[in-house]
Amino acid sequence: RAVGTWQLLEGTARQYGLTITSTVDERCDVTKATEAACRYLKAAYEKYGDWAMVASSYNAGMGRISGELVKQDADSSFDLWLVEETTRYVYRIMAIKQIFEAPYKYGFVLRAQDLYKPIACESVAVSTDIQDLSGFAKKNGITYADLKRFNPWLRDRKLLTAGKTYTIRIPKESDMYYKTPNTYVHN
């Protein structure tokens, strides 16, 4: 099954450099998964030279798209008969592109004051196993829930590093709490 913000399958994730173990799933690490997704998109663009084809392959896989191009003797993803999910996916990507290019035209108005302030985090490099992530969280001044919230790639209550170094994000306490004086009512 596909996991994380970028909905990567396990095989694709591993192919593009992500680690998946019993205690770690880097598909849920937004930064690492984004970098892996970008590597996939770059490879697909180098292969197809066409962004619609890249989008089709992101949904269906490069193997499937390459095979269908040959079987159907087609040159474009728009000329392929694909499953409905993939066809709809490509058109949704095209719609999102239009919205991003002209958000006001489609009724999307985001002002700076409407955006959430990012929560600053300290990065802690970990290269040894942690048997108790709850205790690790407490030692770093946060709850286990906050540790999981800011590090969704942690799959278990422990971290087995297997010789790798991982970066754990620790949110800064001063940024963690909602400040009501900064709130105003929208009419």
Q: Where do the language-model regions lie?
A:
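Short, surface-exposed glycine/acidic/tryptophan-bearing loops
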Residues: 1-17
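Extracytoplasmic and endomembrane cell-envelope/extracellular-matrix remodeling and assembly machinery
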Residues: 15, 20-23, 27-46, 52, ...
